[in-house]
Amino acid sequence: MVERTAVFPAGRHSLYAEHRYSAAIRSGDLLFVSGQVGSREDGTPEPDFQQQVRLAFDNLHATLAAAGCTFDDIIDVTSFHTDPENQFEDIMTVKNEIFSAPPYPNWTAVGVTWLAGFDFEIKVIARIPEQ
């Protein structure tokens, strides 16, 4: 049986303790990262939308790094958006900076009506590189 191990970034934000969940779970050579939002250190949403997206990717980067991964190790992405039509351009600006060369990860974008005060959330599955 494959062991599951919780992974947390350095300087993790208060949402993990408050809502009792792991930033990511390592299972074998896969890393399942919980939805990352654009929260400030106190767990509150960043009000500027593009900055919120950037913070979500910063939080994702920190979680990946805690498991020895980078954005290049991501194989599957699911993102959640409260207003996809009006947010698309800002999201694509940040996405294209981070995933600038193929092969790109799979990506599913989902429009939602509620993200607990946030407007963007991103969860991923990554393959953990061999040590």
UniProtKB/Swiss-Prot annotation:
This is RutC family protein YjgH. It comes from Escherichia coli (strain K12). SUPFAM superfamilies: YjgF-like (SSF55298). The gene is yjgH. Belongs to the RutC family. One of its GO terms (cellular component) is cytosol. Pfam families: Ribonuc_L-PSP (PF01042). It comes from the Bacteria. InterPro entries: RutC-like_sf, YjgF/YER057c/UK114, YjgH-like. One of its GO terms (molecular function) is deaminase activity.
